[in-house]
Amino acid sequence: MAADPSSNSSSVPAANGADYADTASAAYQAALQVIESVEPRVAAATRKELADQRDSLKLIASENYASPAVLLTMGTWFSDKYAEGTIGHRFYAGCQNVDTVESVAAEHARELFGAPYAYVQPHSGIDANLVAFWAILATRVEAPELANFGAKHINDLSEADWETLRNKLGNQRLLGMSLDAGGHLTHGFRPNISGKMFHQRSYGTNPETGFLDYDAVAAAAREFKPLVLVAGYSAYPRRVNFAKMREIADEVGATLMVDMAHFAGLVAGKVFTGDEDPVPHAHVTTTTTHKSLRGPRGGMVLATEEYAPAVDKGCPMVLGGPLSHVMAAKAVALAEARQPAFQQYAQQVADNAQALADGFVKRDAGLVTGGTDNHIVLLDVTSFGLTGRQAESALLDAGIVTNRNSIPADPNGAWYTSGVRLGTPALTSRGFGADDFDRVAELIVEVLANTQPEGTSKAKYKLADGTAERVHAASSELLSANPLYPGLTL
């Protein structure tokens, strides 16, 4: 058994790496020398990427800064090992060390989130969602049909019975949050594979307030009768009552699947508790391991005992060989998240988002729902006469990295959009506090107030002379006061 990090009274090493900068510097300098000897362009781009990240206000809600411990864990010979299967049941010999790191990662995930079961193999959030979808289909559709046919395995079915099962698997219903309300492509939308798996319908938000309307969700569920009710979001700036979502799912006989990819760090950090913690209420919970959780890029599935056996068959159901080096990094990141300092970090993420929202409100900038109570602020840039694409580009000119995003009933569609999504996890990892985020709001408003559309184009814009330079200089002061990976020299 791995040691319980929650008993460790020391704080988590800062994500900026200050606690072991000399060691990390030596490791990266040596690594880059090796890379440079083989392909100098990659080494140069790696150095340039660090410089770019250090010199920009990163407000993309889905990005963060992993600790050097997490980053270094990914650069090992675990990358060389195939390990298809599950712990103790691999299709390859010699996987005992992979079994160890996968076991440690799963143990940390179970303890951190209070889940009966954790599956840490998915390579990404979409892989985690696909594993969850197919586990639900296997449990709710495939298993009963096999029993009806008197078969133990799909390979035992005749061609006719197999075709019957395939048709039934492909004829199920999913109800999820609409894209313009803040949902995600992987929640059953046509351009994504999930939209080709299910008959999908969407629920939205109250058109006047922008908040979830649980009565409307319940009405949609009663009418549509989905097999799967998906809760979770990528651009909704409020908390969700998952107890209510479970009540709705139970009423219509649906499986509640929660995608907490964006806010897993706030769950791990105990900012979201009770009805706002999805894990006790969902049948299946999916997440990424980066974003607010501050780990490596990857995915994870948590499940009740009912769904665990099907989720455990993620390979070969959806996945092939797991990325063993990334599973090892997940174990390190989850160990960090179990330490007390991560709870302080998560609370600061939420506090900083509130400060950012308040900074916009007092400067008369429009916000979807009028504010936030998670880590996301969704800025309605129509209040500046701009599209999301124009705003995103103008902000980038000034060294502020954001992403355009749809807002409810968006008149500019999903490409140009009318919103800009902002998130606080990354800059919080650098040490930014509430006063810093008020200043960030001021700088963003300064850029947008000095940006004008060019003609009728939804993409072209003109930024007033001197604005980009002035804002970039001001943001550089904030960044210098809160350095990224201080002491790390390349």
From Swiss-Prot:
One of its GO terms (cellular component) is cytosol. It catalyses: (6R)-5,10-methylene-5,6,7,8-tetrahydrofolate + glycine + H2O = (6S)-5,6,7,8-tetrahydrofolate + L-serine. One of its GO terms (molecular function) is glycine hydroxymethyltransferase activity. It is found in: Cytoplasm. CDD domains: SHMT. Its cofactor is pyridoxal 5'-phosphate. Its main location: cytoplasm. Its EC number is 2.1.2.1. The keyword Transferase applies. The modification N6-(pyridoxal phosphate)lysine is found at residue 291. It is an enzyme of class 2 (transferase). One of its GO terms (biological process) is glycine biosynthetic process from serine. The record marks 290 as: Plays an important role in substrate specificity. There is a cross-link at residue 362 (Isoglutamyl lysine isopeptide (Lys-Gln) (interchain with Q-Cter in protein Pup)). Pathway: One-carbon metabolism; tetrahydrofolate interconversion; Amino-acid biosynthesis; glycine biosynthesis; glycine from L-serine: step 1/1. The keyword Transmembrane helix does not apply. (6S)-5,6,7,8-tetrahydrofolate binds at residues 179, 183-185. InterPro entries: PyrdxlP-dep_Trfase, PyrdxlP-dep_Trfase_major, PyrdxlP-dep_Trfase_small, Ser_HO-MeTrfase, Ser_HO-MeTrfase-like, Ser_HO-MeTrfase_PLP_BS, SHMT-like_dom. Keywords: Amino-acid biosynthesis, Cytoplasm, Isopeptide bond, One-carbon metabolism, Pyridoxal phosphate, Transferase, Ubl conjugation. Catalyzes the reversible interconversion of serine and glycine with tetrahydrofolate (THF) serving as the one-carbon carrier. This reaction serves as the major source of one-carbon groups required for the biosynthesis of purines, thymidylate, methionine, and other important biomolecules. Also exhibits THF-independent aldolase activity toward beta-hydroxyamino acids, producing glycine and aldehydes, via a retro-aldol mechanism. Belongs to the SHMT family. Homodimer. This is Serine hydroxymethyltransferase.
